[in-house]
Curated annotation (Swiss-Prot):
Alphabetical list of Pfam families matching this protein: Anticodon_1, tRNA-synt_1, zf-FPG_IleRS
Binding residue positions for ATP: K605
Binding site for Zn(2+): C900, C903, C920, C923
Coiled-coil spans in chain: none
Domain characteristics, as noted in the entry: IleRS has two distinct active sites: one for aminoacylation and one for editing. The misactivated valine is translocated from the active site to the editing site, which sterically excludes the correctly activated isoleucine. The single editing site contains two valyl binding pockets, one specific for each substrate (Val-AMP or Val-tRNA(Ile)).
EC number(s) on file: 6.1.1.5
Role: Catalyzes the attachment of isoleucine to tRNA(Ile). As IleRS can inadvertently accommodate and process structurally similar amino acids such as valine, to avoid such errors it has two additional distinct tRNA(Ile)-dependent editing activities. One activity is designated as 'pretransfer' editing and involves the hydrolysis of activated Val-AMP. The other activity is designated 'posttransfer' editing and involves deacylation of mischarged Val-tRNA(Ile).
Reaction it catalyzes: tRNA(Ile) + L-isoleucine + ATP = L-isoleucyl-tRNA(Ile) + AMP + diphosphate
Location of the protein in the cell: Cytoplasm
Protein name stated in the entry: Isoleucine--tRNA ligase
Cofactor dependence: Zn(2+)
């Protein structure tokens, strides 16, 4: 008996079945780096239209977490997909290197500046520490498969970048947006510094909730407003507050001009309250009986004066729209030094902006005997007792409410009026211009627009000064007496920037003012403040994008960060760009959600539900992490767990196995010599290429709209449905048994080749390592890397006007599905083993029969049976099985003949060929003759 196995075209490839990614990926990375893959891509894309995704800099502190992985991989997917779309898309990663977290780490190592080390030594250690953190994070980002200019990233502590940050401040000053003022700012006593909006988080806190009486200074004048001549006891305007510690700074009581206020008599005292709140105040104060003596509008009480409850001065009643009826008494205790609304209304009435609290959060000497030197939050109970002793406390209770806290220390913060530098939102129309610019940006998801519009519309002036050591200096000179900026500020800023560009920020602190001011040095002093780190990162469109040569002077096309950055980097970048350029720094802003565990819980070390990207890469490989991110709808919360990653690994195996099948069956195929022209190909092969074409159209549209989970879904559908459950199954017979160089086989290989060329490109942005590996096994001459290529343009499909068009094959697929059900039932009943043991008779109506008959003798190949007959529907015997397809019944029987040892089909002509007596006639033709002809399947 002959060994016919050697006559088969069995699949063969060196492409491994197992990905073994954790082991294989580092070797690939080494090759990418040694061959300068990023540089190769840049050279290949030179001269193309640019797409610039500007990297929002992560903070240079600590190891990367799973959220970092999401962010960087999403960016990498976009950059790579844009490259495949024909763009030159350089990616320059960056890091945020100044600021408090690094200072705190360095303090733990060497102590505070000015104690064990000088400020200069402290800054040098901060720079060294930040560089170490950058190196660690960089290694992890590279391990993720993210391609970028890792040898030349931007760091906000680069001397040139520090200088350009200073220059950005100079342009803001030139355009009239900077001012100085003693405004209340978020202040952290633990930090000893002002905080930016983005550095504030909210947590629940329990505070005293108190109603406090302010007695009228001129009782008769107050009573006259209510049309009352006398009352029993003192007349008091009642305020409600949850911050008793701010009462020493009280300088007014705010009322709403439009509200109705009532004079209410209780036992031994007359109270002034908003009419709509009288009942709720009485209820919480435990007062069951009261009498309304009179009423008036809030406007009637303007500028009447009331005695401070424990300090020896009186304060005016003033009017403000910020007073509401949501809670309280309708009268708001007003301390301009401790609240933005209070500050605005105090400015309007030209009131003192009192700030009796020092930078450490303790009262200054001279505030009040029992309070001097006390920490404000510890003083709350003291103040309640003082009010009780003075008879000014109407009611006290504990209230749990959301309270602003320091993002770093998690401790409650205060509003505190300090001399600070601000970017004004309104003095030169920055708010109005920013709101206008927002409308010209594409926000993805689109709810991002309303979110940032609300933030810009309601935000206060931006306090950009900080009292820190490790930061970019404001580099300003102010007059010793007037505190006005030097008239040559623009020129001086450039002079300082040049020194910083040469020697770093220490150059500012080492600078002798006389070196740049000359004789003016006697009258001007250096501003000691540093810039808010959000100014550092928010100015990178100017300090980095505008100056890096690879960006060619183009503005950024996209900013992509987590959804918390609407009030962070997106906001600060918008403010600075609009202030210095009059336009937004980006065309598109894309946000992603935060990672949660499989149960939807926030990641927390204390819960123990964190997922380490390093662990995932070491165990499963970066491509599994990348596929998980690519397959997730990142617009909301992004769930990750061992089980979810396992599902990603399963999906990966399906895709890898498909790719391996394609490669194995391209063995011996040279696309230059062996390709079959589309018009000469077997119809089914053209259909398969058409499936790839249809899939590519959807995949490219999904990449274009950044819906990467749709890319993965369509890729999986293509591999599992069109290919895995139909086409790849059907072609095995023709691929393995036809003559190796026959049109029948080469047609199939031509289809597999086109499909492979497309598939590897679809995968490349998401499963980059695997795509590169597949690329290296594909036949034919090609570029060194798939990442330098564009989407495959060699796909074609069936014309809708053809008889065997896509709709025709869709019907064949439905018939095959019904046949499979009948075969499966027969196997379960032990009537047959495999499908090739079956012969099926399809009883079809005229319409369906007409389609099935077009496949002629090749129909059984499409059904994976040894025989297939088509009969009239009405001739179906009772034993024929009904199907879910209207007009189709199926009868199954055992195939006649014997099993051919070569093709495994059951045939009645085995032995008919004398030269090859062991095999069927078809195989004999394929082995020793001209080979079978296939037209359809």
């Amino acid at each position: 008996m002959s060994d016919y196995k050697t006559t088969l075209n069995l699949p063969e490839t060196g492409f491994p079945m197992r990905g073994d990614l954790a082991k294989r990926e580092p070797d690939m990375l080494k090759r990418w780096y040694e061959q300068d893959l990023y540089g190769i891509i840049r050279n290949a894309k030179k001269g193309k239209k640019t797409f610039i995704l500007h990297d929002g800099p992560p903070y240079a502190n600590g190891s990367i977490h799973i959220g970092h992985s999401v962010n960087k991989i999403l960016k990498d997917i976009i950059v790579k997909s844009k490259g495949l779309s024909g763009y030159d898309s350089p990616y320059v990663p960056g890091w945020d290197c100044h600021g408090l977290p690094i200072e705190l780490k360095v303090e733990q190592l060497i102590g505070k500046p000015g104690e064990k080390v000088s400020a200069a030594e402290f800054r040098a250690e901060c720079r060294k520490y930040a560089a170490e953190q950058v190196a660690g994070q960089k290694a992890d980002f590279i391990r993720l498969g993210v391609l970028g200019d890792w040898d030349r990233p931007y760091l906000t502590m680069d001397f040139k970048t520090e200088a350009n940050i200073i220059r950005a401040l100079g342009r803001i000053i030139e355009n009239g947006h900077l001012h100085k003022g003693a405004k209340p700012v978020h202040w952290c006593a633990d930090c000893g510094s002002a905080l930016a909006e983005a550095e504030v988080e909210y947590y629940d806190k329990t505070s005293p909730s108190i109603d406090v009486a302010f007695n009228a200074s001129d009782v008769a004048a107050v009573l006259a407003k209510f049309g009352v001549s006398s009352v029993d006891g003192p007349v008091s305007l009642v305020i409600w507050t949850t911050t008793p510690w701010t009462l020493p700074a009280n300088r007014a009581i705010s009322l709403n001009a439009e509200f109705d206020y009532q004079l209410v008599q209780i036992d031994g005292q007359a109270l002034i309250l908003a009419a709509d709140l009288v009942e709720s105040v009485m209820k919480r104060a435990g007062v069951t009986q009261w009498t309304v003596l009179g009423d008036c509008k809030g406007a009637d009480l303007e500028l009447l004066r009331f005695k401070h409850p424990f300090l020896s001065f009186d304060v005016p009643a003033i009017l403000g729209d910020h007073v509401t009826l949501d809670a309280g008494t309708g009268a708001v205790h007003t301390a301009g030094g401790h609240g933005p609304d209070d500050y605005v209304i105090s400015q309007k009435y030209n009131l003192e902006i009192a700030n009796p609290v020092g930078p450490n959060g303790c009262y200054l000497s001279g505030t009040y005997p029992e309070l001097d030197g006390k920490f404000v939050f510890k003083a709350n109970d003291l103040i309640v007792e003082i009010l009780r002793e003075k008879g000014m406390l109407l009611h006290v209770e504990k209230l749990q409410h959301s309270y602003p806290c320091c993002w770093r220390h998690k401790s409650p913060i205060i509003f505190r009026a300090t001399p600070q530098w601000f970017v004004s939102m309104d003095q030169k129309g920055l708010r109005k211009q920013s709101l206008s610019e927002i409308k010209g940006v594409q926000w993805i998801p689109d709810w991002g627009q309303a979110r940032i519009e609300a933030m810009v519309a309601n935000r206060p002036d931006w306090c950009i000064s900080r009292q820190r050591t490790w930061g970019v200096p404001m580099s300003l000179f102010v007059h010793k007496e007037t505190e006005e900026l030097h008239p040559r500020t623009a020129e001086l800023i450039e002079a300082v920037a040049k020194r910083v560009e040469a020697d770093g920020i220490q150059a500012w602190w080492d600078l002798d003012p006389a070196d740049v001011l000359g004789a003016d040095a006697d009258n001007y002093v250096k501003v000691p403040d540093t810039l808010d780190v959000w100014f550092d990162s928010g100015s990178t469109h100017a300090s980095v994008v505008d100056v890096r040569p690879e960006f060619g002077g183009h503005a950024a096309d996209m900013y992509l960060e987590g959804s918390d950055q609407h009030r962070g980097w997106f906001m600060s970048s918008l403010m600075i760009s609009t202030a210095i350029k009059g336009k937004a720094p980006y065309r598109q802003v894309l946000t992603h959600g935060f990672t949660v565990d499989g149960q939807g819980r926030k990641m927390s070390k204390s819960i123990g539900n964190t997922v380490s990207p390093q662990d995932v890469m070491n165990k499963l490989g970066a491509d599994i992490l990348r596929l998980w991110i690519g397959s997730t709808d990142y617009s909301g919360e992004i769930a990750v767990s061992d089980e979810i990653l396992k599902r990603s690994a399963d999906a990966y195996r399906r895709i890898r196995n498909t790719a391996r099948f394609l490669l194995a069956n391209l063995n011996g195929f040279d696309p230059q010599k062996d390709s079959v022209k589309p018009e000469d190909m077997v119809v089914l092969d053209r259909w398969a290429v058409g499936c790839a074409k249809a899939a590519q159209e959807e995949i490219l549209e999904a990449y274009e709209s950044y819906d990467f989970h749709r890319v993965v879904q369509r890729l999986m559908q293509f591999c599992s449905i069109e290919m895995g459950s139909f086409y790849l199954d059907i072609i095995k017979d023709r691929q393995y048994t036809a003559k190796s160089d026959s049109v029948a086989r080469r047609s199939c290989q031509t289809a597999l080749y086109h499909i492979s060329e497309a598939l590897v490109r679809w995968m490349a942005p998401i499963m980059s390592f695997t795509a590169d590996e597949i690329w290296s096994y594909l036949p034919g001459k090609r570029a060194q890397y798939v990442f330098t290529e564009e989407w495959y343009d060699g796909l074609f499909g069936l014309d809708a006007s053809e008889t065997m068009n896509d709709a025709f094959w869709a019907d064949i697929l439905k018939v095959r599905s019904e046949v499979n059900k009948v075969i499966e039932q027969a196997r379960n009943d032990k009537r047959i083993g495999g499908s090739l043991e079956a012969s099926v008779t399809l009883y079809a109506d005229a319409n369906l029969a007409g389609k099935l008959n077009q496949l002629r003798q090749e129909l059984h190949f499409a059904l994976l049976t040894s025989k297939a007959l088509v009969e009239r529907y009405e001739n179906a015997p009772d034993s024929a099985q009904a199907t879910e397809l209207t007009g189709l019944k199926i009868a199954l029987s055992e195939a006649e003949g014997h099993k051919c040892p070569r093709c495994w089909h059951y045939e009645t002509d085995i032995g008919s060929n004398a030269d090859h007596p062991e095999v069927c006639g078809r195989c004999a033709t394929n082995v020793g003759g001209n080979g079978e002809e296939r037209k359809f399947v």
